[in-house]
Amino acid sequence: TLRNAIDQALAADLGRFWWAGGKLRYRSFAPSVGAPYPVQAVRDNFAKAARTYGAEQRRRHGVRGNVTPHHAGVIAKTEFSTWEFLLDDEFMGRGLIWPKHLSVVFRGPWPARQAGAVLTQARDLVATLRDFRNRLFHHEPAWKRYGVLTEADALQHLQEKIGKAESLLALIHPENLRLLQANGLLRDAHRACTAGEIRRFQHLAQVHKVNSLGKLARLVDQSALENSALEARVYRGSQQRFLLIPS
């Protein structure tokens, strides 16, 4: 979502290959002086993405030699860090991509009136989520962090991360957040990070005996109100178990 928002804004202004040919200017530029780390990181990431795209095309289609870069193909191969680096203050200033395109990329309610403060908050959100994403991709415990000592600490930490994702989505465009809410994805994520779900997967959750439609209706209401998955047991000749999940 962030990738597409930035790409669409910059492509409309600087052309489809806006990252190439020196189009992406930065604040501290000086002749014969190397680019600062965030700027060089963006360049390196796009160069790597182009190589990855080319290698994939040669492998998939049996093409030899150079492969003509394809805008969407290169963008799709960029690392997530690319978009964090693009939010660096080096790209903020007169004639630069920020704040010129800030209101196009971040169409939701701004947390501050100053463009610089908005850019900083967006960058902090992305940095936090990138670190969390990397932890998940490397199969590290998602809940681990300094100061997390108890189950309650871990669950609060995970809920905070979901909140960060919601904040970033809302900042980019409220419609993005609305769609995820409508599909139940965020609700499911919040429910997954609860003590009730831990107990359920430990097979320690209460199993509710359903012996009437009234009891079933009350459990359905409870599940929806608490955003919880409830285990139910029904006897119809033999015992049958069901899971009630909000939809």
Report the location of each language-model feature.
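Amphipathic alpha-helical interface elements
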Residues: 1-247
